[in-house]
Amino acid sequence: MVRIRKAEPADAKRIVEITTEAFLQYVKAAGIKDTPALHEGEEQVLEDIKNKDVYVALVEDEIVGSVRIQKMDEDTVYLSRFGVSMEHRNLGIGKLLVNYLDAVMMQKKVKHIILHTASKASHLIKFYYNRGFYVDDVSKDKGYIRVQLRKDLMY
């Protein structure tokens, strides 16, 4: 059974491990050499736990996924550092995390969730499309083509 909760400081090390694992796959899929997520340490995760909404997915007592949410303005949040451990992928954990976030954000009266992903990471774009996201913008601001995906929450 999967359980989702807000991250605690003691979770930081495992969150770094999952983020690194997920973003090593991301750079391969994106055809890029590097991403800031691969250079993040426990200190940054602890800072995010303090200043953002960070959630973890657990199977039994093991953290197997994580995601971060940052408020952009009154109506919009930014989803980042979303990842599920390799061992636990394709089991529906990512879907559960997104569904959970949708419910929490609707309770908070958030209207839009946005995120960025590489245009070449078609499996991620498909995943997000299947969760109700759509392409809102395209940019090359990081040196490769990224799409901004957006989800409008319905009340």
Description of each model-found segment:
Residues 1-10, 155:
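Conserved N-terminal entry element of GNAT/NAT acetyltransferase domains
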Residues 3, 17-46:
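Conserved GNAT-fold acetyl-CoA-binding loop/helix
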Residues 44-56:
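A short helix-loop-beta-strand connector motif used in the catalytic cores of GNAT acetyltransferases and
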Residues 56, 62-70, 78, 83:
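Conserved beta-strand in the GNAT
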Residues 71-80, 89, 110, 141-145:
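A conserved beta-turn-beta hairpin within the catalytic core of GNAT-like acetyltransferases
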Residues 84, 90-103, 130:
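Conserved acetyl-CoA-binding loop-helix of GNAT-fold acetyltransferases
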Residues 105-117:
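Conserved GNAT acetyl-CoA-binding A-motif
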Residues 115-125, 141-144:
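Conserved beta-strand-loop-alpha-helix junction that forms the acyl-donor binding cleft
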